[in-house]
Amino acid sequence: MKPRHKRALMIVAALAVIGIAALLILNALNSNIALYVTPSDVVAGKAPQGQAFRIGGLVKEGSLKRDGLTVHFVITDLVKDIPVSYTGILPDLFKEGKGAVIQGNLNPQGEFIASEVLAKHDENYMPPEAKHALEQAQKNGSAK
């Protein structure tokens, strides 16, 4: 084989390896993306269908009910409420009236089945997107 053909073959092989690696990386990133929505968005039908997503808001006062490892509560943006079911150990800072971001899927009955629950870590912190979404939901709810 001529050196020119070897070089061309090496370039083609390198491009193929880079292309396959890029495809695998993009596929992995796409499967780990979880869109963020508010309870008002979910009620309005703006939640992604058939994929996991995140809901952020406040845990509604008086809604927390424990049944062994399964916990039922309501997440609210102070305009709309979504019932949530989670099986697992909740974070220590998870409390009623405090902010939370939950990841999971919506079942056909309208209950959010959480696979992960995150609680805000101090009384002053709220993720910027959660704060903005709560403000927007309150503004839209009071405008109606």
From Swiss-Prot:
Sorted alphabetically, which keywords does the UniProt record give? Cell membrane, Cytochrome c-type biogenesis, Heme, Iron, Membrane, Metal-binding, Signal-anchor, Transmembrane, Transmembrane helix
Record has Nucleotide-binding as a keyword: no
Which cell locations does it reside in?
Cell membrane
According to its record, what are the GO cellular component terms? plasma membrane
Cytoplasmic compartment residues? 1-7
Recall the GO molecular function terms of this protein's record.
Answer: heme binding; metal ion binding
Q: Which residues form the signal peptide?
A: none
Annotated TM spans: 8-28
Positions of heme binding: H121, Y125
GO biological process: one example: cytochrome complex assembly
* Topology class, membrane: Single-pass type II membrane protein
Give one Pfam family, short name only.
CcmE
- Give the Extracellular compartment stretches of this protein: 29-144
Role description: Heme chaperone required for the biogenesis of c-type cytochromes. Transiently binds heme delivered by CcmC and transfers the heme to apo-cytochromes in a process facilitated by CcmF and CcmH.
Tell me the NCBIfam families matching this sequence: PRK13254.1-1, PRK13254.1-3, PRK13254.1-5
Give the family this protein belongs to, as stated in its UniProt record.
Answer: Belongs to the CcmE/CycJ family.
The protein in question is named Cytochrome c-type biogenesis protein CcmE
Task: Please name the source species.
Answer: Polynucleobacter asymbioticus (strain DSM 18221 / CIP 109841 / QLW-P1DMWA-1)
